[in-house]
Amino acid sequence: FWAEEIFRALRGEPLLGSCSRLTELDMARSFQKKGRTPPAHDFIGPTGRAQGTESGVIWRRLHMEGRYRNLVAQVAVILAQSAWSYEAGKVRFGVSVDMRHRQPGLRSTGNLTNLIYLNMLPGLTVDDVTRDMAQQLADKNDGMLYWGDRLIRYVPLRMLHRAIQDEIKEKQHTGRYRNSGIISNPGRLSPERLSCDTFALQTGFFIPPCQESLPIFIAMAGTDQCVEILISMSRKLANGGRMAGLMERLQKGLQPS
């Protein structure tokens, strides 16, 4: 919404504006009263275990021409297969869902997203995963919250920072994580809405905000003509050619419409 509003201003068009103060917690509570209990942190990552001593996060972009149906499901299946190529273990992906569709007509600049979760099993097909996501959305699982979601805003930043650093060390030592990764698909960008007299959009992408306590974060965007896949991950999980290998696996495995 906010990017489209900027281009309305650049084109000299009337602005729509927004006075919404809705948060993702408020949005979730508005349509789902059930909560969820977190499973044990026992999930493996798509590129094996942490190696080396280099800290920090690295990101790369994969540009692919054409249109791709069921893109989230395709990516989830490929990432799961990659994880099992390194070791046996449980694989679960969080999929970011924009909850704005729960309130049609809402105009907000907030990040009104929550996660649904895909528990991957060997033999699951893209169609299986697609049906699972559709059923979870029908059940309104995108509004289910963990108890910690309600409390984290009250945790002092210093305490939160220390907890995150401790978790990074633990997860990278054990090779077992809260999730195998996060997959986000904001959808196709509209060149018409994101262009003006002096700028014509050809493609666009989002750099996913990965943390070192998470094996991988993938964000996908693009237009009707192409898809952009952005991958971010810890340097300890990307080194040794593993990130490049995963990108090659995605490039070869994704099937266009």
Go through each PLM region and give its residues.
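Non-catalytic, low-complexity flexible loops and terminal extensions
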Residues: 1-63, 249, 253-257
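Acyl-thioester-dependent acyl-group transfer interface
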Residues: 59-61, 84-257
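Residues at or immediately preceding the N-termini of alpha-helices
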Residues: 68-69, 126
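Short, hydrophobic/aromatic alpha-helical segments in well-folded domains
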Residues: 78-79, 246
